[in-house]
């Protein structure tokens, strides 16, 4: 083993320390956890100069695409936004101890289901420094210890942010092991986290398709994840044309690179000749390009032809796949074939059609007369989010504080024994 290789038990030791620290955190008061977050926000502001210098080193060494460089880059405004994000999480209701349900049995037993922390969370993410701050804040508030493994591109930035989070914990009298990062960027740490069954309770990956697919394939720990955000907007025959125009422009172009951006536009054949030419022109003048099926090209002939793979592609760019469909059921069949179970939207004034679409779409989030870009923890009122989940168990959609809890049953008796 080379001298600078990570020791095999680094993640194991961190997880054991996190387990002990997490027990203290889980039993702490709301006020104590809020104090930690407010103090961490102050520490982040105080370390702004150090953080920007560290971030400049990360950016200077970065060799990837411009869009990823922008996500990596910090400035004073983004540092302040991170600090305000910590304060916002502190202001949110505490999910720990919330009585989710309560009932009495005929024998006099009172049973209640109470929200509790998950335990130790492993967060694996790519090069966005703010993700580490958001994840740490949500885990602290929900009583979970967390191990943050960010991308190697942002390691210098992550260390300064981590120091600020630990300063906040220390100021509140909480164990600093509640928030930890590996000592270096060695990829072996990812494999160790994925194999840490019994030590880490939940893995949350946040990043590109290849990262998420690797985590889901190799993890021996439960995972909350989404591999792609292949979102659809369906313009129904009974859509308000101006509303549809506004929604489609926003859903595609507000921020094309986020997972809630619409990647495929489906237009009902009954309305396509009326709306499609003008809508394509509006999108094109804003820099959008297209991949269209044969029926869409019959209406707008100069559109580039779509391949089968195009409708299964998450573009993350100002590119839109366009198809014409024969009503709600045809739209649902297209989404079932190509979608990623993330977010779908219908634009219509027909309540029956909307209800059919809402009930027939097997995705984490389904919208009626709204942009798919509203799939966001902040927009849902969750405060910050730690990611989006498209699986079928524990949590679906934006993952906020409530989704970072599990529950226990408390049974209160007056001396009952079972016959």
Spans of features found by a protein language model:
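N-terminal Rossmann-like NAD(P)+-binding subdomain of aldehyde/semialdehyde dehydrogenases
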Residues: 1-111, 138
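Solvent-exposed alpha-helices and their adjacent loops that cap or buttress functional pockets
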Residues: 102-103, 111-117, 139-140, 171-175, ...
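ALDH superfamily catalytic-core signature
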Residues: 8-9, 46, 126-145, 160, ...
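NAD(P)-dependent aldehyde/semialdehyde dehydrogenase
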Residues: 269-371
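C-terminal segments
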Residues: 3, 8-15, 322, 349-419
């Amino acid at each position: 083993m080379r001298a600078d290789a990570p020791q095999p038990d680094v993640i194991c030791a961190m997880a054991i320390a996190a387990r002990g620290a997490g027990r203290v955190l889980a039993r702490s008061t709301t006020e104590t956890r809020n104090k930690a977050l407010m103090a961490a926000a102050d520490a982040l502001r105080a370390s702004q100069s150090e953080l920007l210098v560290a971030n400049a080193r990360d950016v200077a060494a970065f060799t990837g695409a411009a869009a990823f460089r922008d996500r990596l880059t910090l400035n004073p405004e983004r540092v302040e936004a991170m600090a305000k994000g910590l304060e916002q999480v502190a202001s949110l209701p505490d999910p720990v101890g919330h009585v989710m349900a309560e009932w009495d049995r005929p024998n006099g037993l009172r049973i209640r289901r109470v929200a509790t922390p998950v335990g130790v969370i492993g967060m694996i993410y790519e090069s966005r420094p703010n993700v580490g701050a958001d994840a740490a804040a949500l885990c602290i508030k929900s009583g979970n210890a967390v191990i943050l493994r960010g991308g190697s591109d942002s390691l210098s930035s992550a260390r300064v942010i981590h120091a600020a989070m630990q300063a906040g914990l220390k100021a509140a009298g909480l164990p600093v092991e509640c928030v930890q990062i590996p000592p270096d960027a060695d990829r072996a740490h990812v494999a160790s986290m994925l194999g840490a069954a019994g030590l880490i309770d939940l893995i949350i990956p946040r990043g590109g398709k290849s990262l998420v697919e690797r985590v889901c394939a190799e993890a021996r720990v439960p995972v909350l994840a989404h591999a792609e955000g292949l979102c659809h907007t369906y313009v129904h025959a009974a859509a308000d044309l101006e509303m549809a125009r506004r929604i489609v422009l926003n859903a595609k172009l507000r921020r094309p690179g986020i997972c809630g951006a619409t990647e495929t536009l489906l237009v009902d054949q009954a309305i396509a000749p009326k709306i499609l030419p003008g809508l394509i022109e509006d999108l094109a003048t804003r820099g959008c390009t297209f991949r269209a099926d044969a029926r869409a090209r019959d209406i707008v002939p100069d559109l580039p032809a779509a391949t089968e793979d195009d409708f299964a592609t998450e573009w993350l760019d100002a590119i839109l796949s366009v198809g014409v469909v024969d009503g709600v059921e045809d739209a649902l069949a297209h989404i079932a074939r190509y979608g990623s179970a993330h977010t779908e939207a219908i634009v219509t004034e027909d309540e029956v059609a909307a209800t059919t679409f809402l009930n027939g779409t097997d995705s984490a989030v389904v919208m009626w007369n709204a942009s798919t870009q509203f799939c966001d923890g902040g927009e849902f009122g969750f405060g910050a989010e730690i990611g989006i989940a498209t699986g079928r168990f524990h949590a679906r959609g934006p993952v906020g504080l409530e989704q970072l809890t599990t529950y226990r049953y408390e049974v209160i008796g007056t001396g009952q024994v079972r016959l």
